[in-house]
Amino acid sequence: MQKILFVCTANIFRSRFSEEVYNHLAIRLNLSSRAYSAGLMVGHYKTRTIYAPALEQLELLNIVPKRKDELSIHINDLDLGQFDQVICMDKNEHQPMVRKNKNLINLDIEYWDIVDEPLVSRNIS
C-alpha cells in the first residue's frame, strides 16, 4: 500500500484536510493508497485537533473525518521511511522550516503552493 504524508505547520488545517479528503476518495475508489499528516511546528499552537473551518469544509463535501478528535502529530514523531511520498503544503512557508530540521535533511519532499489563508494565528489555534 502506498503511503503519502501531507505536511503543514501545525497539522490542524491544510494537511489534516488533505489527509481526510485523500483517504475518503481512496476508499471510495478502492485505491491501494492512504494518506497521513503531520506538522512542522506542532506545539507552537494552542489547538491540537483539526481546525473548525476545515471541519466545516469537510462537512460541505459530505466527508466524515476519521481523525476528528485526534491530536496533531509532529513530523519528528513519525518514521519517515515508511512514506512513499512527502508533500509540504506551501513551499515558501515550509521549506525554511524543513531546512532547519536535521531529521528532514535527506528527505525527498514535494512542495506545493497552498497558502494558509487566512493565516492561522497562534493565539487562535
Regions picked out by a protein language model, each given a short descriptive name:
Residues D84:
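Conserved acidic residues
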Residues H44-Y45, N92-M97:
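Short, charged/polar "capping" segments at the starts of alpha-helices
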Residues Y22-L25, P53, D90, V98, ...:
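Hydrophobic alpha-helical segments
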Residues L40, K91, I114:
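Active-site loop/turn elements of alpha/beta-hydrolase fold enzymes
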Residues A10-I12, K91-H94:
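Short glycine-rich anion-binding loops that position phosphate/pyrophosphate groups of nucleotides
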Residues Q95-S125:
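Phosphate-binding/catalytic loops
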Residues M1-G81:
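Conserved active-site segments centered on acidic
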